[in-house]
Amino acid sequence: MSEEDIRAARLEKVEQLKQLGTNPYAYRWESTHHAAQLQEQFADLASGEEVDLEVAIAGRIMARRVFGKLAFFTLQDETGTIQLYLDKNRIQESMADIDADAFNHLKQLTDAGDILGVKGTIKRTEKGELSVYVKQYTILTKSLLPLPDKWHGLTDVAKRYRQRYVDLIVNPEVRQTFRRRAQITAGIRRYLEQRDFLEIETPVLQSEAGGADARPFITHHNTLEMELYLRIATELHLKRLIVGGFEKVFELGRIFRNEGISTRHNPEFTTIEVYQAYADYNDMMALTEGIITTVAQEVLGTLQITYQGEPIDLTPPWRRVTMHDLVKEFTGLDFNSFQTLEEAKTASKNAGIPGVDEAKSIGKLLNLAFEEKVEANLIQPTFVIDYPVEISPLAKPHRSQPGLVERFELFIVGRETGNSFSELTDPIDQRERLEAQAERKAAGDLEAQGVDEDFLTALEYGMPPTGGLGIGIDRLVMLLTDSASIRDVIAFPLLKPEGSVIKQFSYEQKTQTLTIEFDSGSVYEYFKVPPSVKEDLDNAPSKGQHFNKFIKGKFKFEQLS
């Protein structure tokens, strides 16, 4: 049966339930247990044994096996699954005053996907399956759409992200990923709060987009008649709080950057930024180690983990090494020895580093060499320290190395996971750096920062020596859940509209069959599609949007591949 036929059949069942006086969309249910509790509590119950303890449980029917006077359902709740043992005589006796034909109605009017509440006792069947031996049932929600085929599951990756609710139903490991994400963020907050850090929320809508080199999303406030930006970082407002007298502050929240999408990047993502007065980047390294190792131990119970087949040892202390030394280690280039940019470019080209001609300074060339030749090799936790000043406009100059700043980035499995500075507190130096950024912005650099005059005013009132830290929550969750893509750890990642991925389509006039191939490789046939609909699709400026509005859900279809 097609999905539309299944939906139509289930709608008929909805009407039948209503005619029987049953509301197929109940108001509430009182459970006494969850599936996992029962599985644990009665793990030692012998086959064939029954416990005279009445329980009430609710969940989604994941599978049905129906016989003459017996039926076996698999019920899934948030914690796991348990079998329902459904005996006609027992149910009819218990529900005689409610529904004289309760067992047959259960067989005929329920489907996999429905949400069911049951009351009964605990029994382990002769085959060894722990079960709720049902006395009474209540249909709590009648589903209209079928779950994915139980053998093949939901395997279309794009559909998994697009219909995360279905992904969560059929893939328990996905639910576990988001449980762990919640445990990780709670653990980070707990770690910081135990050390007297205070979480303070800062604006998402900002008049200046600052705190990072990134392209912002732009919006407009109608009443104030002003352009606003979704924040690209929480840094500048948290620093204002340090100026105001708070000594330990943080914010764990959403950041928005109008940039590309990849397995490591989503335009909307989560970070935590932490600022501590009277501290420097050495203190932030210790704090970073403490946060990540504590959370890993709490959530996973170990510091020896595996990421995509690669063993990772999170045991501190982690390696600390300068960017200069790493570039020399992996390329043989000693950037401390170069006297001119041209000399550095020539040596870099000889070392096979791409994009050398675009570099405008030795510092930027050093960073390019690091990104191209070093980053991917930093598998074990590594603090890369002492960055060029050109790429770090908000960091304090290095106290002993001219041209560098006191900054580190934490790399694990070849990707940046954290970033930290000894924060720049000199308002004159900060103004000069931001004005240089503003010149780049005026010249067309969409990622350069502007001059935030209010932030500079705050610095002129005096900011104490401060250490700052940012950790990418999504990447940390990826690491601790062994997830290959950032989309696997964001519940609802940003995706192109489904209709916009039409690759090609064809139309058979005689049978009025429209065949559409999507970029994902899926091919669908839509039946009894009038020629006028096909002509409108031909002429539509956005075929994907036209498909979503005028074809999807309007015609019977069959998936060919």
UniProtKB/Swiss-Prot annotation:
Residues noted as binding Mg(2+) 1 in the record, renumbered to the chain: 409, 416
Cited InterPro entries: Aa-tRNA-synt_II, aa-tRNA-synth_II, aa-tRNA-synth_II/BPL/LPL, KTSC_dom, Lys-tRNA-ligase_II, Lys-tRNA-ligase_II_bac/euk, Lys-tRNA-ligase_II_N, Lys-tRNA-synth_II_C
Keyword Transport: no
Named cofactor requirement(s): Mg(2+)
Biological-process GO terms, alphabetical: lysyl-tRNA aminoacylation
Reaction(s) the record says it catalyses: tRNA(Lys) + L-lysine + ATP = L-lysyl-tRNA(Lys) + AMP + diphosphate
Coiled coil: none
One Pfam family from the record: KTSC
E.C. no: 6.1.1.6
Group of enzyme by EC: ligase
Chain sites annotated for binding Mg(2+) 2: 416
Location within or outside the cell: Cytoplasm
Cofactor binding, note field: Binds 3 Mg(2+) ions per subunit.
PANTHER family: LYSINE--TRNA LIGASE, CHLOROPLASTIC_MITOCHONDRIAL (PTHR42918:SF15), LYSYL-TRNA SYNTHETASE (PTHR42918)
Name this polypeptide is given: Lysine--tRNA ligase
Subunit structure: Homodimer.
Species of the source: Nostoc punctiforme (strain ATCC 29133 / PCC 73102)
Similarity comment: family membership: Belongs to the class-II aminoacyl-tRNA synthetase family.
Cellular-component GO terms for this entry: cytosol
